[in-house]
Amino acid sequence: MEQTFAYYTTIFREDFTLFCKSELQKEGISLGLLYFVIYIGKKPGCSQRELAAAVRADEGYAARSVEKLLQDGFIERRRHEKDKRMAILTLTMKGEKTFEKAHSLFHEWDDKVLSSLQEEEKKQLFTLLQKLGKTKEAHLCMKK
């Protein structure tokens, strides 16, 4: 197969998924649900609708995911103090622990994958990835 950016991103995604799988099983959470925990950890007090938009999930999938995270004790849902019609999501202690674990897992994987690069090369790589992430075309592809 021709070596394209899509090829490499697919390979890295598969590798990252396999790397995380066993550690996440110990935490009792899937990689898909972990992204919900990460967003709530970064934006405590977010709404379910905001969460769905941020992780690019439809509202039905987001609702099922939130229910699963509630049942498994990773998050809690409360009424907004000022707008009682709105519910806000926050992490529980278990969720906080998982959020911290995710942070260390992501850095551990980065360290392993990028170990052959010099510091300057890593900076260049991240600069290029950030530039790609900001392009209009990249976002259009992600929405399809």
UniProtKB/Swiss-Prot annotation:
Gene3D superfamilies, per database record: Winged helix-like DNA-binding domain superfamily/Winged helix DNA-binding domain (1.10.10.10)
Q: Which residues bind DNA?
A: 48-71
Q: Which domain of life is it from?
A: Bacteria
The record's listing under InterPro entries reads: BilQ, HTH_MarR-typ, Tscrpt_reg_MarR-type_CS, WH-like_DNA-bd_sf, WH_DNA-bd_sf
Quote the protein name from its UniProt record: HTH-type transcriptional regulator BilQ
Domain HTH marR-type, residue spans: 1-134
Q: Which gene encodes it?
A: bilQ
MF terms from GO for this chain are:
DNA binding; DNA-binding transcription factor activity
From what organism does this protein derive?
Clostridium symbiosum (strain WAL-14163)
PANTHER family named in the record: TRANSCRIPTIONAL REGULATOR, MARR, TRANSCRIPTIONAL REPRESSOR OF EMRAB OPERON
Signal sequence extent: none
Instruction: Please indicate if the UniProt record lists Transcription as a keyword.
Output: yes
Which keywords are on file for this protein?
Answer: DNA-binding, Transcription, Transcription regulation
Ribosomal protein as UniProt keyword: no
